[in-house]
């Protein structure tokens, strides 16, 4: 099967700036995820709950000693946070949605300009690639590169795969699913007797009677 590159439409606003700062001025260095699925809204509640592995209960002396005691707990929470996040991302969490008639995958690529993204299909697989050379950001110099592959559902026509880029930097790749064969209504077929067989039997009986005479 030949390789096919999928063009994507831009849904950018007129004032879009590809290299503008997407995050507040106090963004941290580890807030530079790219090429990863968008995190569900429920995760923000999960991260702040006492049930997740990265949660650290404030030290008893925190109220008495002020911010210094809270700072001691922060280094303990950060590694656990990253371990839990990596476990979730490596376990197959992804924005893949499939309805009765459509297959769709969403990917956060806000660090890449449109010309730095490539979407193509080959042998029933959608491959998304993003790459930009070293450039300066608020933390220094950085270059990024990623490749993600998704298997198309059986029966999907690769030539019908399309993609679009939203103003928020979310790449959406989708394709229509093949229509299932509709089952016909139940029909009762009557059984009929062939008249020729009956006529043939009567003629054979007459010939036997004439031969006996």
Curated annotation (Swiss-Prot):
GO biological process: anterograde axonal protein transport; chaperone-mediated protein folding; negative regulation of apoptotic process; protein refolding; regulation of protein phosphorylation; response to heat
Molecular function, one GO term: protein homodimerization activity
Region Interaction with TGFB1I1, annotated ranges: 78-213
Cytoplasm recorded as keyword: yes
UniProt domain sHSP: residue ranges: 84-192
Subcellular location field: Cytoplasm; Nucleus; Cytoplasm, Cytoskeleton, Spindle
Pfam families in alphabetical order: HSP20
N6-acetyllysine modification, residue list: 131
Residues where Omega-N-methylarginine is found: 12
Cellular component GO terms, alphabetical: axon cytoplasm; cytoplasm; nucleus; spindle
Modified residues (Phosphothreonine): 182
PTM (free text): Phosphorylated upon exposure to protein kinase C activators and heat shock. Phosphorylation by MAPKAPK2 and MAPKAPK3 in response to stress dissociates HSPB1 from large small heat-shock protein (sHsps) oligomers and impairs its chaperone activity and ability to protect against oxidative stress effectively. Phosphorylation by MAPKAPK5 in response to PKA stimulation induces F-actin rearrangement.
Phosphoserine carried by residues: 13, 15, 27, 90-91, 94, 106, 184, 207
Chief location of this protein within or outside the cell: cytoplasm
Keywords, sorted A to Z: Acetylation, Chaperone, Cytoplasm, Cytoskeleton, Methylation, Nucleus, Phosphoprotein, Stress response
Quaternary assembly: Homooligomer. Homodimer; becomes monomeric upon activation. Heterooligomer; with HSPB6. Associates with alpha- and beta-tubulin. Interacts with TGFB1I1. Interacts with CRYAB. Interacts with HSPB8. Interacts with HSPBAP1.
Functional summary from the UniProt entry: Small heat shock protein which functions as a molecular chaperone probably maintaining denatured proteins in a folding-competent state. Plays a role in stress resistance and actin organization. Through its molecular chaperone activity may regulate numerous biological processes including the phosphorylation and the axonal transport of neurofilament proteins.
Family the entry assigns: Belongs to the small heat shock protein (HSP20) family.
Protein name, entry field: Heat shock protein beta-1
């Amino acid at each position: 099967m030949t390789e096919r590159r999928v063009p994507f439409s831009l849904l950018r606003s007129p004032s879009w700036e590809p290299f503008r700062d997407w995050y507040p001025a106090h963004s941290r260095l580890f807030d530079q995820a790219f090429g990863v699925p968008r995190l569900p809204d429920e995760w923000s509640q999960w991260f702040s709950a006492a049930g997740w592995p990265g949660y650290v209960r404030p030290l008893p002396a925190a109220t008495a000693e002020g911010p210094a005691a809270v700072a001691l707990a922060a280094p303990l929470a950060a590694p656990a946070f990253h371990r839990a996040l990596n476990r979730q991302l490596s376990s197959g969490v992804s924005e893949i949605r499939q309805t009765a008639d459509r297959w769709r995958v969403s990917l956060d690529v806000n660090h890449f300009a449109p010309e730095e993204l490539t979407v193509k299909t080959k042998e029933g697989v959608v491959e998304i690639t993003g790459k930009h050379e070293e450039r300066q950001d608020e933390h220094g110099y950085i270059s990024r590169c990623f490749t993600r592959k998704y298997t198309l559902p059986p029966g999907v026509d690769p030539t019908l795969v399309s993609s679009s880029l939203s103003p928020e930097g979310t790449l959406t790749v989708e394709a229509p699913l093949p229509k299932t064969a509709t089952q016909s209504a139940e029909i009762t077929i009557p059984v009929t007797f062939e008249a020729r067989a009956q006529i043939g039997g009567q003629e054979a009986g007459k010939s036997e009677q004439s031969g006996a005479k």
